[in-house]
Amino acid sequence: MQIRHFNRLKRSVLLFASVLLLSACQIESQPKSEFEKIQERGVLRVGTLNNQLSYYIGPDGPAGLDYELARKFAEELGVKLEIKPAFRQADLFPALKKGDIDIIATGLNQTSQAVKRFRPGPAYYYVSQQVVYKKGQLRPRDIEQLIEYQASKDSQSEEDVNAGAQTLKIVEQSQYVPTLTALKKQYPELQFEIVGDADTRDLLKHVSTGELRFTVTDSVELSLAQRLYPDLALAFELTEDQPVSWFTRRSEDESLYAMLIEFFGNIKQSGELASLEEKYIGHIEAFDYVDTRAFIRALDDKLPRWAPLFQKYSEEFDWRLIAALAYQESHWKPKAKSPTGVRGMMMLTLPTAKSVGVTDRLNPEQSVRGGVEYLRRIVARVPDTINEHEKIWFALASYNIGYGHMMDARRLTKAQGGDPNAWADVKDRLPLLRQKRYYSQTRYGYARGDEARNYVENIRRYYQSIIGHVSQKPSIDEDTDDLQVIPPLNPELLISGAVETIAEEVSGASDITNEVDEDLDQEEE
């Protein structure tokens, strides 16, 4: 009796053990999530476009809006970042589908075609699709006028019946293909050519040189391109504003997508996203055709002569930023003079020149060295509560109107409920320093704050134009395959843990008060 009981107990134990073993095997055989694979690999593989907005190699290493966001996302995941830049957008989605990259981070429109095949992340800015033409030529103001122009080209060309199609080209697998394809169903006469051996920047250049009549790009890309090709102009808009986002693979596994949602939610709430967008695209709205044409000529005629001088003395600064500052000051004229007494390449006042050891303001080498030293001293005074990448804009405003007036603008910003550590907020208050109702309550009084704002924004535009001009030849060799890993110039930039300081949140007041002054007093000292 005891033996039978023991045997039953033995069988029960063996059965229970078998169930446990089977369960363990099933648990081990469950596929790992996307997020777990990335953690195990220790690397987030990001595909992006090599251009002046998403990703480029600067003097201090990788830069660009999408690069900085991707670096921060990798930090959040606790892994290293591996950037795989492409020259052609057409290479990105196939690489994502094959699993060669984990994310596309280059600001693509959420078109219906892309959304069906891949999962878009949160929108982080908006653009419209625009038809672009060359200033001075026939401007179609809608799709019907464009079709009329193409029809006239067909009738004029006896040798090529497709002459109309060759007037409008777009990039293969771009967000513009489904837009024009849908329009062609509505307007069968519409003609366009899809090219696979060029990117949008190439086509924009061809429009500027007259090799191509029209192309399609987005509103941000056009604004950036106009700094290099001022003849480019908007013909008409094809779409309303559309969301721009990153993309991941579409599957039942939402682990990486969930992390992406949380990441963008956090940086939006903290203001970090707005700060980065201000850094890269906050300056592109205004466009002066005449000034830009003169600047582009100077890039070819004058910059090659003075670039070595800017590179020699820039030290911790990007030499292209120093070049932009010098152009704003003197248009790269070493003998420049002003009725107000400022002189030279960097337009130094006599007291400023003496303070930085400049004995001859009209000597370009002394002027550049002195101007950089003066800027360095101002940057050192800018409060550490301001994000590192925004300090330079506050310093440039101080270079123009004086440090005290810049601090007044910060106090005014805080009093009105803005963030005194965010350039986007402070630059909007600078013009108020002209108005008596505001400057009468400030410490340093009246100032031409609107000129200081324009001064800084001009320098930012010149800076981006120089970046684009210098990098028209790709940062990597043309023979290099797309999506090849580019080793960073500074490996520390790709290691998680180097989290940047986020500007502290500030609660504003409705009036300028002594309390506001006291909060910023220590920073000014």
Swiss-Prot record:
Membrane topology of this protein: Peripheral membrane protein
Give me the stretches of Acidic residues compositional bias.
514-525
Q: What is its EC number?
A: 4.2.2.n1
Region annotation LT domain: where it falls in the sequence: 286-525
Q: Which GO terms describe its molecular function?
A: peptidoglycan lytic transglycosylase activity
| Region described as Non-LT domain: spans on this chain | 25-284
**What catalytic reaction does the record list?**
Exolytic cleavage of the (1->4)-beta-glycosidic linkage between N-acetylmuramic acid (MurNAc) and N-acetylglucosamine (GlcNAc) residues in peptidoglycan, from either the reducing or the non-reducing ends of the peptidoglycan chains, with concomitant formation of a 1,6-anhydrobond in the MurNAc residue
This protein's source sits in the domain of life called: Bacteria
Q: Coiled-coil ranges per the record?
A: none
Q: Name one GO biological process term.
A: cell wall organization
Record family assignment: In the N-terminal section; belongs to the bacterial solute-binding protein 3 family. In the C-terminal section; belongs to the transglycosylase Slt family.
Q: By what name is this protein known?
A: Membrane-bound lytic murein transglycosylase F
Q: Please give the organism.
A: Vibrio parahaemolyticus serotype O3:K6 (strain RIMD 2210633)
Identify the gene encoding this protein: mltF
